[in-house]
From Swiss-Prot:
Full protein name: Tubulin beta-1 chain
Species whose genome carries this gene: Hypocrea virens (Gliocladium virens)
Family the UniProt entry places it in: Belongs to the tubulin family.
InterPro entries assigned to the protein according to its UniProt record, in alphabetical order: Beta-tubulin_BS, Beta_tubulin, Tub_FtsZ_C, Tubulin, Tubulin/FtsZ-like_C, Tubulin/FtsZ_2-layer-sand-dom, Tubulin/FtsZ_GTPase_sf, Tubulin_C
Bias (Acidic residues) ranges: 429-445
Compartment annotation: Cytoplasm, Cytoskeleton
Region spans: Disordered: 425-445
UniProt-annotated binding residues for GTP: Q11, E69, S138, G142, T143, G144, N204, N226
């Protein structure tokens, strides 16, 4: 029941996705080939959210792996968890998108998209009651951004009433992989604003900072970064995968987190932060977890929530935690830091509990926040976009794939609208209802 179909597109999406499957296989007691060897019934109870049961006590992820070039796929297939996935679910092209959004969205990706949708349909038909889709991708490249957003809109057409969650790696302020990142990201945002229900924004630079500052890793690898992301993804999906006192699912999360349909871009945090090798040496308490998870240095997106206000946020605690303790803690946070929360949404913190902690920890917590400060990211990308677009730099790569300049202009203004919407709600107060009075319907009785 309540299954989720997972898609991973492009190099980044496949690497993050593989780390995620590695993490949750471990939590459910599955080995690298999907055979169950766990100890607790609770690991099995809701395994079918992410896994199909095959013959011989083997579980197969409901995952569709997509890329426009075979390289990353081969790496996944020959990696430690390569035997986990169903071989038919690897869908790849040969040409690559070359960091070009238009190739991913209109030419190369569009040729491959029907094959992917066949696999998605087959996975969806295997579900008793499909809850929704989650996709991991980056917004800066070509495949994850261009083809990823194409898949999202196609799936949206076919399954309009199912949830669509995306884990999107957004371009970071200082670390850039490609020159045309601002173009790709803006074109993707244009799509995500319309077609995604919840987007968890992750950003490499923030992850680097966490690795270096908190985990004291002098030279973090992508493996370390993906380990952090998979911890958050595992945390967000916890209450779907394990029984808990206060369960939430993708839809409940969205209902509690998204006050206005376009504003569905979340910051995420996790506590206690540990590197794969080192585990926490001291007993962690709920106040400490809360402290760490709400610390701006621990946010996995490079924007500081102190520059904005939280519309809503959600916390997921795992392990042996007392419900009352968590609620008191949350209440006190809201009272102490009331300036960081908008006052026109009275109880804007949602809490979920799950009794099973992640592997190697006693208790942990995951934080998801819908903060107006996320506009920093969009504003930054928008400025870089405008700087290049004004000179029409690199545009020929996109127009030669059949794109129109209009589309760039639309994406740019959509992104600017998003920034100003966030700003508008950041400045709104509980009692400035006067400006809307004249629009209120008049009761003629």
């Amino acid at each position: 029941m309540r299954e989720i179909v997972h898609l991973q597109t492009g190099q980044c999406g496949n690497q993050v996705g593989s780390a995620f499957w590695q993490t949750i296989s471990g939590e459910h007691g599955l080995d690298a080939s999907g055979v169950y060897g766990g100890t607790s019934d609770q690991q099995l109870e809701r395994l079918n959210v992410y896994f199909n049961e095959a013959s011989g006590n083997k579980y197969v992820p409901r995952a569709v792996l997509v890329d426009l070039e075979p390289g990353t796929m081969d790496a996944v297939r020959s990696g430690p968890f390569g035997q986990l996935f169903r071989p038919d679910n690897f869908v790849f092209g040969q040409s690559g998108a070359g960091n070009n959004w238009a190739k991913g969205h209109y030419t190369e990706g569009a040729e491959l998209v029907d094959n992917v949708l066949d696999v998605v349909r087959r996975e969806a038909e295997n579900c008793e009651c499909l809850q929704g889709f989650q996709i991991t991708h980056s917004l800066g490249g070509g495949t994850g951004s261009g083809m990823g957003t194409l898949l999202i809109s196609k799936i949206r057409e076919e399954f309009p009433d199912r949830m669509m969650a995306t884990f999107s790696v957004v371009p970071s302020p200082k670390v850039s992989d490609t020159v045309v990142e601002p173009y790709n990201a803006t074109l993707s945002m244009h799509q995500l604003v319309e077609n995604s229900d919840e987007t968890f924004c992750i950003d490499n630079e923030a992850l680097y900072d966490i690795c270096m500052r908190t985990l004291k890793l002098s030279n973090p690898s992508y493996g370390d970064l993906n380990h952090l992301v998979s911890a958050v993804m595992s945390g967000v999906s916890t209450s779907l995968r394990f029984p808990g006192q206060l369960n939430s699912d993708l839809r409940k999360l969205a209902v509690n987190m998204v006050p206005f349909p376009r504003l569905h871009f979340f910051m995420v945090g996790f506590a206690p932060l540990t590197s794969p090798g080192a585990h926490s040496f001291r007993a962690v308490s709920v106040p400490e977890l809360t402290q760490q998870m709400l610390d701006p240095k621990n946010m996995m997106a490079a924007s500081d929530f102190r520059n904005g206000r939280y519309l809503t946020c959600s916390t997921i605690f795992r392990g042996k935690v007392a419900m009352k303790e968590v609620e008191d803690q949350m209440r006190s946070i809201q009272n102490k830091n009331s300036t960081y929360f908008v006052e026109w949404i009275p109880n804007n913190i949602q809490t979920a509990l799950c009794s099973i902690p992640p592997k190697g920890l006693k208790i942990s917590s995951t934080f998801v926040g819908n903060s107006t400060a996320i506009q920093e990211i969009f504003r930054r990308v928008g400025e870089q976009f405008t700087a290049m677009f004004r000179r029409k730099a690199f545009l020929h790569w996109y127009t030669s794939e059949g794109m129109d300049e209009m589309e760039f202009t639309e994406a740019e203004s959509n992104m600017n609208d998003l920034v100003s919407e966030y700003q508008q709600y950041q400045d709104a107060t509980a009692d400035d209802g006067d400006e809307y009075e004249e629009e209120a319907p008049v009761d003629e009785e």
